[in-house]
Amino acid sequence: MNTADMESLATTISQSKLKLYKRALILAQITIFYNLVEGLFSVFFGLEDETLSLAGFGLDSFVEVISGVGILHMVRRLMRNLDTNPDQYEEKALRITGFSFYILAIGLILTSILNLYRGHKPETTFWGIVVAVISIFTMWALIHYKIKVGRQLNSEAILEDANCTKTCLYLSFVLLLASVGYKYTGIGGIDSVGAVLIAVFAFREGRESFEKARGKSCCCD
């Protein structure tokens, strides 16, 4: 292969990589915007209807925003420096995602304890059902495309962000089951056990993010 062919191949690879980074950027922007809207909506109606699970779900949406911002920052820097080793940027993004998982786990456990302690019953769970259904479809689509782009770029940070979104998908199912369960049984603490299980999952994913970040740090060294 002569020099001209090598330069042409390098240009093609760079263009392909840039296209994938643009997709990752759009996914991060959608994640941030959607979760900001969902978080504000959920917290407002959660407090309005005294539905702790919905309010807690809204706070968890803000955690997803943190992870999305980390990915957004990483992708923008990599788009400006396509030939740079992405490990140093991915390490920071993985740590941000790891912290997001830990915050999510703590928030879920505290919300569950508060639910059980107060034995609180919401006025209505209608908005919880609406938010959960919309969130399930949105999170599923985001997970699908984040995993696809993450694998194509071989980016552990984007794949971990997909796991963060997956945790929110599971939480959406818990919110839906809790809202429907309360509607038909009147038991206010139905979601507590499921929320604790998700908290355990979130903690494990957070720990894995930090382990991968340490691996990236070693590679950088």
Protein language model regions, located:
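Alpha-helical transmembrane cores and adjacent cytosolic helix/loop segments
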Residues: 2-221
